[in-house]
Structures are given as structure tokens and as C-alpha cells.
Design a protein with these regions (language model features):
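Active-site acidic/histidine proton-transfer and metal-coordination neighborhood
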Residues: 70-162
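Active-site beta-loop-alpha junctions enriched in small/polar residues
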Residues: 9-13, 29-33, 63-65, 104-106, ...
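Acidic/histidine-rich catalytic cores of soluble enzymes
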Residues: 125-208
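N-terminal pre-domain/capping segments
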Residues: 1-86
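Charged helix-capping and loop-helix junction motifs
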Residues: 40-46, 76-85, 113-123, 150, ...
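A short acidic, helix-capping loop that chelates divalent metal ions and anchors anionic groups
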Residues: 66-72, 106-111, 172-173, 200-204
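Acidic (Asp/Glu)-rich catalytic clusters
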Residues: 15-23, 40-60, 85-95, 127-131, ...
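Hydrophobic faces of well-ordered beta-strands that scaffold small-molecule active sites
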Residues: 2-10, 24-28, 58-62, 99-101, ...
Length: 215
């Protein structure tokens, strides 16, 4: 993989320095927690500007806590739309070429068919309400099979909505090998998250430390 395709997550406070030294991009993860876009914005903004200084290639990871596009409660769905719109504006503010958002599947709350059907409705409405050129990459977390998110982006059929494959999440939550997910995602795959674990928990371990052969 070429350096031009690699990004370091700002979860690591040294990500910006390493990315500048190695010619890499950065994935801004500071807004995964929504309060960093609200009452903690000034502090977070200073940190993000320091991390991204001099780095042209940027991706922004949006918030995900308690956000479910397929929520049964209409107010919960409105909250997801509000936070995603906020993240879209942040991506534009920081010049991020892509916005990564979790699909929002929770197996103890939603049947897969409901999740897909209602997510399609949510994203069609969201994209219609937010015109312009941008790219949203839906990331797998607890989805057990690639068909779930794949069905969503196929049905929405908007080039602004594509997929982010998180191989560590696949290893923790799916019995289907990551390489098969990648093959099925095909032309809809726009971004990857690479980290490892022993399949028992989503530990976000370094690449050589886990059961995925990535050393």
C-alpha cells in the first residue's frame, strides 16, 4: 500500500508529528465523542489544528455514541441526523475529503431487516437534505456479515455514500473472514481501518498483535 493511501488516527497524540515525518495523512478522531463539538470545541479545535498542521490529506471520523440511524424513536433518529450534519460541517471546516460514520447496527436492539430498511430511508433523506460534494463512508462495527451495509449503499445508490471496512471489528464480531468482506465490498470500498485483536474483544491492538495475519 502506498503512503498516499495511509492515514494515522489522531487517537494517538503523536499522529500529526509522525504523519508529517512520514508523508502520511491523518484521520481526525477527536470528534468521535460528540461533546468535543459542543462545550469542548475550543480546546478540541486547538488540538485538531495542531495535529493537522501541514497535512493535506485528511479524513474525519464522526461521533457514534448513542447514534442509531435506524432508531425506532423518531427523536433518536433526529439526534443521529443532527450529529451527522454537525460532523459534515466539521469535515468541511478541516478540509477532510471523507467522513467516516458507524453504520449503527446493534444486534440486541434491531433485526437485520429493520436495520437495513430504515437505514436506507434515513440516508436517502439525509443526502437529499444535504446537497454538495462530499463522501460518507459507513463503517462496520457489530454487523455480522458484509451484506448488511452493502445492501444499504446499493439501495441508496448515491455516489456520496460508500463503505469503510474495519478489519478489527470484523475479527471481533463476524465469523466471515475480512478478505471476504473486502471482496464483497468491491467498488463501494473507499476506506480501511487497520488494527488487530485476538477475536475475543475489540482491543484496537497494533497490527502484529492479534489473530489477523497482518505482521
Amino acid at each position: 500500500m502506498e503512503r498516499s493511501q495511509l492515514y494515522l488516527s489522531t487517537i494517538d497524540p503523536e499522529a500529526g508529528n509522525i504523519a508529517r515525518a512520514q508523508g502520511l495523512g491523518v484521520e481526525i478522531a477527536d470528534f468521535c465523542t460528540a461533546c468535543n463539538a459542543d462545550e469542548l470545541f475550543d480546546e478540541t479545535n486547538r488540538r485538531v489544528l495542531a495535529q493537522t498542521r501541514g497535512i493535506a490529506r485528511r479524513v474525519l471520523h464522526g461521533p457514534f455514541n448513542e447514534l442509531f440511524p435506524c432508531a425506532i424513536d423518531p427523536l433518536a433518529r433526529k439526534l443521529a441526523a443532527y450529529r451527522y450534519a454537525q460532523a459534515l460541517e466539521l469535515a468541511r471546516r478541516y478540509g477532510a475529503q471523507k467522513l467516516v460514520l458507524h453504520g449503527g447496527y446493534c444486534p440486541r436492539l434491531y433485526f437485520p431487516c429493520w436495520y437495513v430498511e430504515q437505514s436506507v430511508a434515513f440516508w436517502r433523506e439525509f443526502l437529499a437534505q444535504h446537497p454538495g460534494a462530499y463522501e460518507i463512508c459507513l463503517e462496520n462495527v457489530m454487523e455480522e456479515a458484509p451484506e448488511m451495509l452493502l445492501s444499504i449503499v446499493r439501495q441508496v445508490a448515491d455516489p456520496r455514500l460508500c463503505l469503510c471496512l474495519d478489519v478489527g471489528h470484523v475479527n471481533s464480531y463476524s465469523g466471515i473472514p475480512a478478505i471476504e468482506w473486502m471482496a464483497q465490498y468491491g467498488p463501494w470500498l473507499s476506506h480501511l481501518h487497520l488494527h488487530n485483536n485476538d477475536a475475543s474483544a475489540d482491543t484496537h491492538s497494533p497490527l502484529p498483535r492479534g489473530s489477523l495475519p497482518m505482521a
